[in-house]
Regions:
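Bacterial N-terminal signal peptides
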Residues: 20-31
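Sec/Tat signal peptide C-region and signal peptidase I cleavage site
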Residues: 33-37
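Short N-terminal segments immediately surrounding and downstream of signal-peptide cleavage
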Residues: 38-61
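Acidic/histidine-rich, surface-exposed loop or edge segments in extracytoplasmic proteins
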Residues: 59-91, 117-126
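Mid-length scaffold segments of soluble, non-membrane domains
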Residues: 96-156
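Hydrophobic/aromatic-rich core segments of domains that either
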Residues: 145-208
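Low-complexity, Gly/Ser/Thr/Pro-rich intrinsically disordered linker/tail segments
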Residues: 209-220
Length: 220
């Protein structure tokens, strides 16, 4: 049994493993009242209104490490190239968002020592600079807010993160979320499944919440 527990009475993930080490069950246990959950999912140290010259980055699982970093004007210009030409459709913009988020992760990885972050939780478990879905979803939401603030999202708005859990969807899992303003329909922007700097999953939130994983249907 492996227990990943944040400090100060925050929530805990319990992963129950079989003899081969594969995860059988993962249960999200609440410690204390809902305010404790809010502190864990939305740490107070995270900059809630980030700018390109001052934003937070979480890592080391459940945002146990939070640092402040910045993009220079030249860096910002380079990593936002996919979105600088307005996308003709929401679907095209989602593709551009995925490429932009990947570029942002690559650069942030250099700035924070998280370039070696592996997809999922187990591949890089115990190594410095690794991220779980709490780290990933906070960071992705920050990056999306930066894009929105700069007027680069023309078909979407950034929404609150979403968490899936239940008997048939596996361990609790959290993602960043955007909404197609014309549909309207919400989409998961999930950077957790793959290694740092790879294209994130962007797919309808309702499908994601049903327990989707990369070995299921294709995604954008």
């Amino acid at each position: 049994m492996i227990t990943l527990q944040a400090s100060h009475g925050r929530l805990r993930y319990l992963q129950i493993l079989n003899k081969s080490g594969s995860t059988l069950v993962a249960i999200l246990l609440a410690a204390g009242h809902s305010a404790a959950a809010d502190d864990w999912l939305f740490p107070a140290e995270i900059i809630k209104e980030p700018t390109a010259d001052r934003f937070s980055v979480c890592f080391d699982h459940t945002c146990r490490t939070i640092v402040t970093r910045s993009f220079s004007p030249g860096e910002w210009q380079r990593i936002t190239v996919p979105l600088q030409v307005p996308a003709p459709t929401a679907a095209a913009e989602r593709i551009a968002i995925s490429h932009t988020i990947a570029l942002m992760e690559q650069l942030v990885g250099e700035k924070t020592g998280t370039a070696g972050d592996r997809g999922g939780n187990l591949a890089g478990f115990g190594q410095p600079g690794q991220m779980d879905c709490i780290d990933e979803s906070n960071n992705a939401t920050t990056y999306l807010k930066l894009l929105q603030q700069d007027g680069l999202l023309r078909h979407h708005v950034v929404q609150n993160r979403s968490t899936r859990f239940g008997l048939f969807v596996g361990m609790p899992h959290t993602t960043a979320v955007i909404e197609d303003v014309a549909a309207p329909r919400r989409y998961a922007v999930d950077t957790w499944f793959f290694d740092n700097g790879e294209l994130p999953v962007i797919m309808p939130l309702d499908e994601w919440k049903s327990g989707w994983r990369p070995d299921d249907d294709s995604h954008e």
